[in-house]
Amino acid sequence: RYGVDACPHSWHNILMGLANGHAVAALPNGRVLELCMIQGPLQWDMLAERPPTEDGHLIIGKRAGLAAELAQDVEGRFPYIDGGYALTVQR
Protein backbone atom coordinates (compact mmCIF):
# COMPACT_ATOMS: atom_id res chain seq x y z
CA ARG A 1 0.00 0.00 0.00
CA TYR A 2 2.81 2.41 0.87
CA GLY A 3 5.54 0.94 -1.33
CA VAL A 4 7.60 -0.36 1.59
CA ASP A 5 9.12 -3.85 1.44
CA ALA A 6 8.47 -6.29 4.29
CA CYS A 7 11.67 -7.84 5.70
CA PRO A 8 10.89 -9.75 8.92
CA HIS A 9 13.66 -10.88 11.24
CA SER A 10 13.25 -14.39 12.61
CA TRP A 11 15.58 -14.45 15.59
CA HIS A 12 14.45 -17.58 17.39
CA ASN A 13 13.86 -21.12 16.13
CA ILE A 14 13.32 -22.52 12.66
CA LEU A 15 9.57 -23.03 13.17
CA MET A 16 9.23 -19.27 13.54
CA GLY A 17 11.48 -18.91 10.51
CA LEU A 18 9.24 -21.18 8.44
CA ALA A 19 6.11 -19.30 9.53
CA ASN A 20 7.73 -15.97 8.64
CA GLY A 21 8.97 -17.47 5.36
CA HIS A 22 5.39 -18.36 4.42
CA ALA A 23 4.31 -14.82 5.31
CA VAL A 24 7.04 -13.26 3.15
CA ALA A 25 6.11 -15.56 0.24
CA ALA A 26 2.44 -14.56 0.53
CA LEU A 27 2.99 -10.82 0.81
CA PRO A 28 3.04 -8.73 -2.36
CA ASN A 29 5.83 -6.65 -0.82
CA GLY A 30 7.74 -9.51 0.84
CA ARG A 31 11.43 -9.02 0.11
CA VAL A 32 13.65 -11.08 2.40
CA LEU A 33 13.54 -13.12 5.60
CA GLU A 34 16.49 -12.70 7.92
CA LEU A 35 17.40 -15.75 10.03
CA CYS A 36 19.77 -15.80 13.00
CA MET A 37 22.44 -18.34 12.07
CA ILE A 38 24.02 -18.49 15.54
CA GLN A 39 20.92 -19.48 17.52
CA GLY A 40 22.35 -22.83 18.63
CA PRO A 41 21.02 -26.38 18.32
CA LEU A 42 17.38 -25.44 18.85
CA GLN A 43 17.51 -23.46 15.60
CA TRP A 44 17.76 -26.55 13.37
CA ASP A 45 17.74 -29.70 15.51
CA MET A 46 14.08 -29.44 16.48
CA LEU A 47 13.07 -30.58 12.97
CA ALA A 48 13.28 -34.10 11.55
CA GLU A 49 14.85 -32.60 8.39
CA ARG A 50 16.35 -29.23 7.63
CA PRO A 51 14.18 -27.18 5.30
CA PRO A 52 15.57 -27.09 1.77
CA THR A 53 17.55 -24.07 0.63
CA GLU A 54 18.91 -23.11 -2.75
CA ASP A 55 21.55 -20.39 -3.25
CA GLY A 56 20.77 -18.99 0.20
CA HIS A 57 17.00 -19.00 -0.37
CA LEU A 58 14.56 -20.93 1.80
CA ILE A 59 12.40 -23.19 -0.36
CA ILE A 60 8.81 -23.10 0.90
CA GLY A 61 7.41 -26.63 1.09
CA LYS A 62 4.19 -27.71 -0.58
CA ARG A 63 2.96 -29.89 2.31
CA ALA A 64 0.21 -28.66 4.63
CA GLY A 65 1.00 -26.21 7.40
CA LEU A 66 4.64 -25.22 7.75
CA ALA A 67 5.73 -28.25 5.69
CA ALA A 68 7.90 -29.46 8.56
CA GLU A 69 7.97 -32.35 11.00
CA LEU A 70 9.35 -32.18 14.53
CA ALA A 71 12.34 -34.36 15.34
CA GLN A 72 12.00 -37.32 17.68
CA ASP A 73 12.06 -36.47 21.41
CA VAL A 74 12.26 -32.69 20.95
CA GLU A 75 10.79 -32.09 24.41
CA GLY A 76 13.34 -34.49 25.94
CA ARG A 77 16.34 -32.91 24.21
CA PHE A 78 15.14 -29.34 24.74
CA PRO A 79 13.20 -29.33 28.04
CA TYR A 80 11.35 -26.27 29.25
CA ILE A 81 13.49 -24.14 31.56
CA ASP A 82 11.65 -21.83 33.91
CA GLY A 83 12.86 -18.24 33.78
CA GLY A 84 15.04 -16.50 31.23
CA TYR A 85 17.32 -18.22 28.77
CA ALA A 86 19.77 -15.42 28.06
CA LEU A 87 23.41 -15.60 29.07
CA THR A 88 25.18 -12.74 30.79
CA VAL A 89 28.67 -12.00 29.50
CA GLN A 90 31.02 -10.65 32.14
CA ARG A 91 33.62 -8.19 30.89
Protein language model features and the residues they cover:
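Extended hydrophobic packing segments that form well-structured cores
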Residues: G65-R91
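Shared catalytic-loop signature of beta/alpha-barrel
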Residues: R1-G65, E69
